[in-house]
From Swiss-Prot:
Any Pfam family matching the protein: Cyd_oper_YbgE
Protein name as annotated: Uncharacterized protein YbgE
Phenotypic effect of disruption: Not essential, no change in sensitivity to reductant (beta-mercaptoethanol), may not play a role in cytochrome bd-I oxidase.
Organism, scientific name: Escherichia coli (strain K12)
Length: 97
């Protein structure tokens, strides 16, 4: 399993993908600050775990976007950029459409 995670992280560790992760993370963070009621559990159709997942994706996107590469495979799995990018895309689609 650790070899799969390391390979997946290495595939995503390209400069254009890091830039895309960084831009999407900053954009979603800005959206969450701009209109927090759209992401709040009591004032939107989102559950509390959706908000936590979106915040994790922003953190993982910034970590990946600035070029920080975790050394341990455990942290590479927790901050997997592919999963974070998928969540970031879904979050941005939710906000803008």
């Amino acid at each position: 399993m650790s070899k799969i995670i390391a390979t997946l992280y290495a595939v995503m560790d390209k400069r254009p993908l890091r830039a895309l992760s960084f831009v999407m993370a900053l954009l979603l963070a800005g959206c969450m600050f701009w209109d927090p009621s759209r992401f709040a559990a009591k004032t939107s159709e989102l559950e509390i775990w959706h908000g936590l997942l979106l915040m994790w994706a922003v953190c993982a996107g910034v970590i990946h976007g600035v070029g920080f590469r975790p050394q341990k495979v455990l942290w590479q799995g927790i901050f997997c950029p592919l999963l974070a990018d998928i969540v970031l895309i879904v979050g941005l689609i939710f906000f803008f459409f």
